[in-house]
Amino acid sequence: MIKLEMDFVLSEKLWKEAQEIFPGGVNSPVRSFQSVGGFPFYVSRAKGSKITDVDGNDYTDYVCSWGALIHGHAHPAVVRAVGEALKDGTSYGANSPLEIKLARLIQSAMPSIEKIRFVNSGTEACMTAIRIARGVSGREKIMKFEGCYHGHSDSLLVKAGSGALTTAVPNSAGIPPCLSSLTLVLPWNDRQTLLEAFKRQGKETAAVILEPVLANCGLIPPEEGFLECLFKTAREYGTLVIFDEVITGFRLALGGAQEIFGIQPDLTVLGKIIGGGLPVGAVGGKKEIMDSLSPLGSVYQAGTLSGNPLAMAAGIAQLEQIKKAPPYSHLETLGSELESAIKDIQRKLPIPFQFNRRGSLFSFFFTAKNIRSATDVYSVDKKRFSCFFTSLLHSGIFLPPSPFETAFLSTAHSETDIDELVKFVYDILKKMP
């Protein structure tokens, strides 16, 4: 049951202690609740679509470990697989047959992946993909899109400069300008600027990396023809195409966004779902490109915990469950019901907001403007979102604690969960000034 009268005594105590130990009190910035105010809660356990904090407050969870938990928390098959693997040890520093089994499951779903290398995070996978692209092409520059997040490696943690075609400036202290100067940042869904960028710098560009459905600046799908234009143009200039499917892989479809859009990238970056909730990342692609990696080729990459048996076991269990009972029809039904109800609220209430959805991913944007690029997202009403988030949290609904993030559905969510979310959204927005 949802506990509507909440207290956060233990969470507040832990938060005060955490601030003495961790920078900003957290091990990942968004968890600080800095974007929404107040202090974060601390989780004691989770099961299905619910999480419970240390004070005993229950929440319906729409963060789902940032998309990793497509079957919800503590799915029996995943828990069982990790428990069995744990009996055989936590890490070997050597090869395991589990690596091969998980790789085969991924290959069977994504034909573009002829060879694959496991790493420990999406950041590491994106960093490796860029190194591969530079190594095989002999070129140094890369293109990315404003609002697309590819982890916190130096070359990719950048935003656009004063003009759409300028080189990027660092989005963090500690990044030498000489590194970010090799990254060109383009506006999302802008074909004309894309074509101009390739005309000017395409022959110097090793790769263009993108989330095929932008999901780290809220949810912003590509407009019709945009990905096809990008792929065709990249081919003309000999530029590799890297799909960052850390979020969309195995979530939009079994074959990810590349299945949905019918595009086979040169390299694919994966994470989240393929680890069943444990730390993992992967980069895969064409054999001739992937064979540039050491020990076969001259592009170096290594990792002590790469292919960790616990993460491999969890990933195998999750992907086998997906193949055994494909969740996409159920998730689309839930998502469609949610979208229809939210659109009805939009018609009834004067509060200006947008609701974007693709499959089991969705975002609320407090603005009257249609959202088609990161620039549109940056102008949303952050104070209104903060009020919205906090009111939902105190109603037992946990959305991502930032106006710039995407929420997720899982197979553990029920129609009752959706009805409850819709009810609270309506009640909160009806009272909002």
Swiss-Prot record:
It is found in: Cytoplasm. Its cofactor is pyridoxal 5'-phosphate. Keywords: Cytoplasm, Isomerase, Porphyrin biosynthesis, Pyridoxal phosphate. The keyword Transcription does not apply. The modification N6-(pyridoxal phosphate)lysine is found at K272. This is Glutamate-1-semialdehyde 2,1-aminomutase. Its main location: cytoplasm.
